From Swiss-Prot:
Active-site residue list: 76, 151, 175
Alphabetically ordered keywords of this record: ATP-binding, Ligase, Nucleotide-binding, Protein biosynthesis
Keyword ATP-binding: yes
Gene that specifies this protein: gatA
GO biological process, one term: translation
Function: Allows the formation of correctly charged Gln-tRNA(Gln) through the transamidation of misacylated Glu-tRNA(Gln) in organisms which lack glutaminyl-tRNA synthetase. The reaction takes place in the presence of glutamine and ATP through an activated gamma-phospho-Glu-tRNA(Gln).
GO cellular component terms given for this protein: glutamyl-tRNA(Gln) amidotransferase complex
Self-association and partners: Heterotrimer of A, B and C subunits.
One of the Pfam families matching this protein, by short name: Amidase
GO terms, molecular function: ATP binding; glutaminyl-tRNA synthase (glutamine-hydrolyzing) activity
Organism expressing this protein natively: Chromohalobacter salexigens (strain ATCC BAA-138 / DSM 3043 / CIP 106854 / NCIMB 13768 / 1H11)
Name of the protein this chain belongs to: Glutamyl-tRNA(Gln) amidotransferase subunit A
Family: Belongs to the amidase family. GatA subfamily.
Highest rank taxon of the organism: Bacteria
Amino acid sequence: MHDKTLTELAAGLRAGEFSSRELCQSALDRIQRLDGDLNSFISVTAEQALADADAADQARASGDAAALAGLPLALKDIFCTQGVRTSCGSKMLDSFVAPYDATVVEKIRQAGGVSLGKTNMDEFAMGSSNENSFYGPVKNPWDLSAVPGGSSGGSAAAVAAGLVPAALGTDTGGSIRQPAAFCGITGLKPTYGRVSRYGMVAYASSLDQGGPMARTAADCALLLETIAGHDVRDSTSVARVVPDYSAELDTSLAGLKIGLPKEYFGDGLDPEVETAVREAIKVYESLGAKVCEVSLPHTHLAIPAYYVIAPAEASSNLSRYDGVRFGHRCEDPTDLEDLYKRTRAEGFGEEVKRRILIGTHTLSEGFFDAYYLKAQQVRRLIRQDFLDAFDEVDVLMGPTAPTPAFDLGAQKDPVSMYLQDIYTIAVNLAGIPGISVPAGFAGNRPVGLQVLAPHFAEAQLLGVAHQFQQATDWHLKRPAFGKEMA
């Protein structure tokens, strides 16, 4: 069962080929046997999962099964889950148990989905390799010496290894799409505001967005239908009708206009990655699409702008972790200042401290105008680049990341790590949706094709990705890891 897609498992449950308990128990057995080598989960909620599976079986027997009834899933450990630890991969929240569910968690429960646990992540979603977790690095099931990408590396690795058929991640600068590419799965970052952020621990509030990670675009469509929608508890969520994404997958690509940003095919792009991506684009041409070159002239400014805006917002958001109300608290503080200093020094990891310092500096008097306001001006230029491009073409395509997954410990320099997100960060700054789909290999490591669409054009994005997956089999490839366990 572990090789099946989410939609295939849903069909199997409807046909009575197996029960939800059997399905969830099988997944839990794989997690127990295999995750010691991957470290993709922080918490596994086996007892609750089996109880939820039994409830789903009873609902199905009574003819009252919801859309995700009985399907096992995993949640990135950034989503609040009532009664279950929500750590954000940090010592600071190692003992924090949320008193409520995030909106997306609530929606998945209402749809009958069964959470098997919380997945590992870069601390507070700050990282591109999943090496910045208090709970240790996650390994890539395609090559255990490689990173899975980040910050949603636990979710990506768990899906790729067949521990769960799908998971939720979050994307602030590429944290769904880049690990999806590195692990050979499909990952969708929705339009900013399409999915509620209520109960999703904040990193950079104007950039964060939750989304699905799964085997296929069809799986992502099924999940997005469930988690998307307006939420009065999130002032940034948008009141727009949620389409039937699954019904719109079977779309013709004849006449589709594809733009290839020339800035995405320049220096720094691994030759094997470029070859795989260009071969994928040839598939689209064979399906009737038209391809042309476009320009996103401010792409080179995306990383510097992002690393002003995101740390500034993080500095503000993470100021609440001071040892007073919740989270880690240092022992025997001498006074309030000592409590603050030692709690934060002990509770945060190095990358989080680095970004807080950058953010505090950019927001400080004398630097706010020079850095933060300038970065916001650049952000508007980047957004306009995309709007201008979409006046000419329907979608944009290019590599998700400039290289395949790199070795654990290989990227020691923070700037070289930040450059891994060069093709994904601008998408968050502009707020548009993007999807990464498996498109080949560089050696034994997967390559992702990134497809971008205008704001709220997820239906088109998913349809374009689905048609590619109907014509290719890259999404059907599975790593050798765990194959011995049927």
